[in-house]
Amino acid sequence: MGGPSKERVWGATIRAADERARETRHVADNAACEAWNMRMQHYGGPAQPSPPIGDAINAGFRYLEVKCAGCNTHSAVDLTTLRRPRETPIWQLEQRMRCRPCSEMRGYPYKRGHLVRLRRTNITTRQADAWYPGDQRDRN
């Protein structure tokens, strides 16, 4: 029974449909994360529903910014290192956030963390300072 195989006949069409579906998922995940960030910014509280961890990572939002209500420390949590299922909504992470400086001061884990927003880059990632002639700082 000769003739072209099903892979040869339909392979390109199926791969193109898979690629369109992947792009559509990325756009939808990005929109959900942006909407959640806007709700967090404008409502100022734990906005529900929140996107799942996997959707945030798929959209490129790798970090979750958390603020301690006690010492006003802002930290970024890398979502790719969490030991939680990817289907876990982000708002459920708030109950597990502990502020390290406040906990060390008290001597036991102390919960004061509040979710701020999802971020694409880490908080410590910033542009290099402009260099000026005569600047005495060490430049490596």
What spans do the regions from the language model cover?
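Basic nucleic-acid-binding interfaces
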Residues: M1-N140
